Amino acid sequence: MKELSPAAPRRALHTRKIECTGYERDDGLWEVEGRLSDVRTWNQGNVNSSRPRAAGEPIHLMSLRLTLDDSFLIVAAEAVTHQAPFVDCDGINDSYLQLVGMRIQAGFTQAVKTRFRGVQGCTHITDLLGPVATTALQSINPQLSRRRAERGEPPPDEGRRPPMLDSCHGWRRGSEPAIIRWGKVGR
């Protein structure tokens, strides 16, 4: 596996972690949970926040859960601000209930950035929606494909342009993965 080249001498200042996990529920629905944390390596006074933060204590700690059906329709949403710089940051959490009824599909990330821009949302929870959406696709699509294959059904992409074709360098038209996955359509 390739690695980055050796770094110059340096010291860590800030770490942002985003972790997302996809789940298959027993009732036939799907869930994706995402969590974002920002941690600094130095003590922060109350200049930019409502209270001081010790080194290693999260400045931001937010979680998001989306519940989806097989068509990627969001049927439930929950956002929680566990820790934030300002005491009223969690006042925006219920705004993310507006995700219910939206579908994760092409244009989703731009749509949520528009819907939750500025004072209509939390920058960090909104930033979490992109990785959560990707995790939904990465979790659910393979399971739906496996189920179709077990039933002997053809892939839904057969005969038409697959949504993933030309979505990135690896899935570019004419690439080995595209040809293997989609045959003539991938050429």
Q: Which stretches of residues belong to each language-model region?
A:
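Short, Gly/Pro- and small/polar-rich lid/capping loops
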Residues: 1-30, 35-43
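Active-site- and interface-proximal helix/loop "cap" or "latch" segments in soluble metabolic
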Residues: 22, 38-187
